[in-house]
Amino acid sequence: TQIMSEGVEVTETQQTVDKKGVKDEMAHQLAKKLKQIAKDCNKAILTQSDKIAGDKTTPRQMGGIPYWITTNVLANGGSTRDFTTKLLGDAQEAAYAYSNGEADTVLLSPAQKRRVNAWTNGATKYMDEGATKLASKISVYESEFGIVKFVVERDLADSVVYLIDPSLWKSAYLRPFAKHPLPKIADKLQEVVVGEWTLEARAEYANAAIKDLKLATLS
């Protein structure tokens, strides 16, 4: 598991004054911190390649997608190459036997999405999504293994793309995120938002990672 927290501090004056559009300064600041925690959680899922048990001096750290996907890793020995339809097909084929074709979501950086737009000649379709995460638009592409959705993630490195089955991943909470009051210091009111959670990978072999990618110059 991993503990994440954000603290808030406001003065009694700030809390008492009814500012335009903000009747409760503490609640307003806590809402902003919750948004930041959501971003931090998403970044941890996408980028944390190590799982750390932790000790008195080192905090615990959960493993993210890079830590969990170990079976279907399409690397190139450190030599970079373009992200192509063939590489995507190879990743789909690698995961297909385990996922029954349910690995249908591609996570990639904004720059790699531009690469996708290039090899689809700008013909990428768009689907309406009832709920979006971090304002990422979702596009689709049909290959011989079926339709995949592309989800742009700003925290992903340009050198890696993930093909996942979202149903096989879950955020599990030992302690759900909640606010807790802290002792008052003089005129300052304090609260903290804290939670403890981890990422569960129910079948990492039904997903794939494409590594050692580069960005070719787009014309």
Where on the chain are the PLM-derived regions?
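Flexible, glycine/threonine- and acidic-rich loop/arm segments that mediate assembly and lattice contacts
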Residues: 1-219
